[in-house]
Amino acid sequence: DASANAGGTVKLIGSSVGGAVTADNGTIETENTNVVNGASVLNGGKLKLKNGTVSGGIKTDAASTSDVVMDRAGASLQGDVSGEGKMDVTLSNGGSWKGSSAGSGETKVKVESDGTWTGASMNSSTDVDLRGKWQQTSNSKVRKLVSTKGTLDKTDSVSGTTDIGHFGGEMSLIYAHDKTNPTKVLGGGTFIAAADAGSTVNMITDNAGLDTNSKKAADKNKVSEALNALAGKLQYTGYKNGERNLKGKLQIAEGLTSSSAGLRTETLSFKGDGQGYLDYMPAKDPEKPDKPSKPEIETGDYETSIMSSTRSALTSSILVWRNDMNDMYKRMGDLRIGAESGLWARVYGGRISYDAHNAYMKDSYWAAQVGMDKRLASGWHVGGAFGYNDGSATYRYGGKGDPKLYTLAAYATRVSEDGQYVDIIAKVGKLSNKFTAYNKYSAPALRNYVEGKYDTYGYGISAEYGKKIRMGKGFVTPQAELTWSRLSSDSFAAAAPSGESMRVNQSSVNSLIGRLGVVAGVESDKGNFYAKASLFHEFDGDGHILFSEPGKTGKRSSFSLKDTWAEIALGGNYYLSPRSMIYADFTKSFGGDYKVDWRINAGIRFSF
């Protein structure tokens, strides 16, 4: 057991407490601690959870006001809140509560945007401030519910009815329906006795059994009937008393490639008794022309969130390939005039990101490359290299990817007596990305994802020219580089856990990047230190993706990676001996949609 009395504080860190926790006007803080096998008693005290679980519930006495705070992703209260005292429950920073408001005292539940409450309110003196998610598990009644874009999830088969004495704000209300009969919406009704002016309820159900893209009258009517059935789950009892403060929106959630279908906010109607309904005119097929049905159904974004998440995964693959094409300084360091044949190796890593045109990705990676070259009598170094790049990518809505790249390269480099150099490299590579792409919904009934694997080959050639101009112990090297590369097309299936799948056909993508740069530094017999500034421009980078589901019209998404950005690098070369050199640099980009958040490169070269 643990207890805190008379304003005292007890901190439980990295332990397990068996039995009750008691706070009589004191504070109990837990961190990495589990409290099990007993209800906690708060008589005017405070229980604050950090990365721990309290099970067994919370009790309060009649003359007290107590607080329970779960303010970490690992903080969880499991059990009911009961008793006659006042209770404030706060869920924030990923904190969660699995239990019910079951007492008789005034209870205030605050669910922040990243908090989750799974349970019910059996106490009519409960007020709810909903910014996150409430997943209802049985019949519930609350005195007041104020929502700031929060979600009431009633997709559980036993969610029951919801009685709200007074409602204010904007809330998403989610229901499930029979997948074989989409017009049968499951779960109990939601009853709102009164509402603040301008309040809105957005009612959503999934798209199973519905085709929102279809132009057929029967399919259109099924969508309308499903929306009407969804509307019927809302009962605005204040309406029959003349109140007109509540508005609603009805929506069929998007699918893999099917866009969402919704109605304008003001078109949700209420019957005389306050029950919601959709006033619509049945559609007819084109061979039987009629006036357009009103209200017109609004279609959501052409590109669904799963489509955009999948495109983000493919975009990350393209950028991984593009990022791996690099200049001579990164690959071999600063070759001296007359450098001999050599063997070199380097490791490099960093993070690249992209957030534009409804595509988002971040890829943290590490890579290694080894190469060998021979100096010819003409002064040219010709050689080859093998490389491996292993990444870990994240996408919007919790998506993730595992991009991998294997490359073979052949290069020719010449450094002249007057400081001029030419570097030409041709590269081929095998690129793969096993990814998971999620949709935008957080409610379990609407949450969906696909898994796929993008597998293709890349080709590229780069030509770089520069001239080192020496100025005493310093030097300046203007540079120009042109890089062309191509990723081949690929076609693959992306499957969802529900059994749905979509075909993804990615076009080939060409890239043409120009770079103008300048290197300035100081040097000695042992090496040099330099700063490099470069300006890049992507002249091409256009492509498209065709998404298709069985029995549905395919959708085409086009994209362009045209962009301009700058990079700044700091680096140096150091000769360990006349036949060995180490080199390293740090790079960061500025401007543009494509960003090199950071990159570190280090290598070693041996001459023989």
Predicted feature locations:
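Outer membrane beta-barrel transmembrane domains
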Residues: 409, 502-608
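Residue-level detector of the transmembrane beta-barrel scaffold of outer-membrane proteins
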Residues: 20, 57, 80, 342-346, ...
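Extracellular/periplasm-exposed beta-strand and loop segments of Gram-negative cell-envelope proteins
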Residues: 391-402, 430-459, 485-514, 538-550, ...
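Extracellular beta-strand/loop-rich repeat segments of large surface/secreted proteins
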Residues: 40, 46-53, 59-61, 65-78, ...
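Outer membrane beta-barrel translocator domains of Type V secretion systems
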Residues: 294-472, 586-587, 592, 597, ...
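Outer-membrane translocation/initiation segment of Type V secreted surface proteins
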Residues: 169, 175-188, 202-364, 368-370, ...
